[in-house]
Amino acid sequence: MKTAAVAFYGAALVLLLAALKELLTGFEENRCSMTYMFEQPEYRRVVLPRRVSRLFPAYGLYLYGEGVYAQETRNLKLSGTPVLFLPGNAGSYKQARSLGSVALRKAENMEAGLHLNVFTVDFNEELVAFYGGSLLRQTHFLHECIKAVLRLYKNLKVPPRNVALVGHSMGGVVARALFTLPRFNPRLVSLIVTQASPHVAPVLALDPYLLEFYVAVRQKWSTQAQKLRNVTVLSVGGGYRDYQVRSGLTSLPCPPGDPNKLALVATAVPRTWLSTDHLSIVWCKELVLATVRALFDLVDPETRQLTDDPERKRAVLNHHFVRHPARTPQDAADPSVSMPDVPEAWSEVNTLRLSYRTPKEGQLKYFLFALSSRRRAYSHFYCRSSSLESSSWVLGCVRTAGSSCASAVDLSSGTELLPPYKVLVLSLSDLSSFTHLVVSASNLSGKQFTVECEWQREAAQTLSVSVPHLLSFGFSVGEVTVNSSGLLHQVQLLHFHQVYQAFRISVVSSCRGNADRLPSVYRLRVPWFREDSFTTASVPSASEISGMLHTSRPGNFSNVLLQLHTAPNCQYKVSIRTSFPKVLGQVLRFCGPMVPVYTAVTLLLACRGQLCSILRSGRAADMMQVVSAGLQPHQVLLPVYLLHVLLSCSCLQDISSVLGLPPEDTLPPTFPDGVEGAESHEEWPHLLSPLLYVLGAAVAFWGSALLRLLIRLVSLFLAPLHRPSVSRTSGTLSLQTQFLLGVCLYAAAWMFCGALAIFTSCLLHLYRVLRLQMTERSLGHMLNLAPNKRKVTANGAPEAEPQSGTSPRGGAPLLSEGALQEVRDDLQLHLSLMPLLILPVMLSAPSLIHWSRNLRFSTRLDPDPWWLHSVMLASVYLLLINATVSKLSISRLLPVISRLPLPLAVTMATFSSLHLYRLAYFLEAVLVPLAFCFIF
């Protein structure tokens, strides 16, 4: 193998490892606080009807409890508001303990005994993210659970009519799938909260049932959106720490403008402001508190049920998850405020900026800002306070009395909570009915805080900077300097609108003097999706922000903004550089499913190279040589792009639909679902195809090298268990044995699981490869020990070496280099085929795991997406066990079969980027004809 090939694939491996490192570790540390249980958690099993238990023996329903509450609810006599937790992929029903424990602690402080009854569903920790055959079964069981939960309250005077669902991961998708059931009453569920749930598309589509399930859910929520308008759905993504489900997939597929469907990222949630991984989003205290507070605020105290008022549900969820005004929703009921008539408490501010720190002693203090003299020169009024207590702190004065305000209207509802303080920005054009603004700085409790306010011109506070080009590799930099004469500045990041862009944004602050200042807050604001991120920094300091997007910008939205809540009299220097490792991480995050597709493409072309070598010379080439030659972008990517252009034509789309051909496969969209102006197809993944092909080829190359090494090592351990053999037929099967094994494998596929038959037949072929490796080693050792002397004829020439399998004077056959070469050829052929044979095993592994974990409930996998595949693949594996280069080289089918891999590779790259399970069809299209070569 050439050194250049090793160097190239070594560099490709470095790129892949850099992308993986950035994807798995290139984010902030886990800043979530742990939720603790103060008493022993208990899970009380709810007895379900016998019919339900018989239909779903692997599933269960439990009530969460602790301490005294667990004892009080032992008989399941309940009076609270029902909340049902749904675990996700491989999730445990015990994950509800964080939600249940915090809800119990919250109920201790509630009046009138309001509390939540948290139920949790046991889905047997099934791998539903990769095996979709159980999703519909889980949906039906959830329907039965809801009916069983509501039956527990039938003795109450006013029993609850619906439940709230909290779903983690695939549990959130199952919650929305409830509405696809023909007998489901939509009134049974009025609120769904999902955590890190991939609503847009599955992370990996490894079987058709998974995609069929998603299509049914999307179609239901799209076609009957008006009927489901009163169902409130909140979807929370984890952010960049969640590398399993990217946050763009958590957006909700719904019509634009539906106010009852809300999707956001945890970094944008008030009082959370952090990223969570896929598991910690369930127990992250900051997020659990927001969820529990919202659930309690949604309970009607009179009926003890979740409110049916869509306006109230929307207001509560916006309050806790979108824009927290540092006050409770009940405080905003009456905006009219009577002001105290205490002249010494009032001060009129005539300067452009106010900076005030309250004394340690409690006092009443109000500042009065006249509006009449500021309307023409300024556009906004900005104010912030480090007091996070709930209060009416900014008011519009309606009637003045001397130097004080007699009557005012509360304007604090527009307050936004930031990590270190609360902020309010008022547009002067909206304040025409007021004469003055009043800012309250009263600290009757004696707790010190700081208030800073100023008049602002929005145009003067907004700057623009173009981000560097993607291929600048960090050498070019976009810079802007903010000489802070104000408290708020905005920097528009021009041309930053695609998910494959990634930047390191550095903000360096320097100040004059050593005065105490409030910390600065840097907010990366994305207008088209709630994925804002916040960075808090002391002054002076140097901070670095990761500039990346979870979603691409639709066409009708403004630019990304970097908001700087700054300290006065300080200078801020903003530098933006492209981060190549982060770009690689983004490429893998959004286009990762294409890597295994191009790995399969490389292995197919490697098989083509091996077949062409046998056809041309009758000898098998080295496995690593043909795999290294499998990277042929000019023969694959150009036809793929031409197919993409052709299939984009409407006339060809009509023809393909008439012929029943599938549409071109595309990755899930990166635009937020349900946003106007989003394009249906994106072109940038085609531009990244060469990079993805290189990464896929690197996986194929180094994976094949690892497989070759493992086969050598395993054969060393197995050699003492086998008698040394010098025959190339070692490990082969007789026709009768092949027939018996085939019958057993078909029976296993029918009675148990198709993936089991595929896995077993692959092991049989692996054993053949191991025996060939042992034979090759034995022959090599024997030939090295044999004497090298040759007899000399009468004319002085050396006597010709006997052919393999012949012997002088009719004796036993002598070993020769020819015999060793034949074994080596067969070994290289099988080594080249082995990665292709392993791919279906890897694709079917989730089905096999699901079947093995459910053996105590059912011995047969139903439905089985791999049953038909197992019949063909098991037959192919058994036939290929006896494959030899000599048989293949004389086959009349070889010239035709050697031409199949290239068009199949092009078709595979076109139609398998989303439907990964289609890889099996293309592999069978090559392997089945190849197996026929050893029959005819």
What are these regions (language model features)?
Residues 1-13, 630-631, 732, 896:
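Classical eukaryotic N-terminal signal peptides for Sec-dependent ER targeting/secretion
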Residues 14-40, 219-227:
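Membrane-interface motif at the C-terminal end of an N-terminal transmembrane signal
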Residues 84-90, 104, 108-110, 116-244, ...:
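Serine-dependent carboxylesterase/thioesterase catalytic core
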Residues 573-936:
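Alpha-helical transmembrane segments of integral membrane proteins
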Residues 22-33, 95-102, 131-137, 177-181, ...:
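Short coil/turn segments at secondary-structure boundaries
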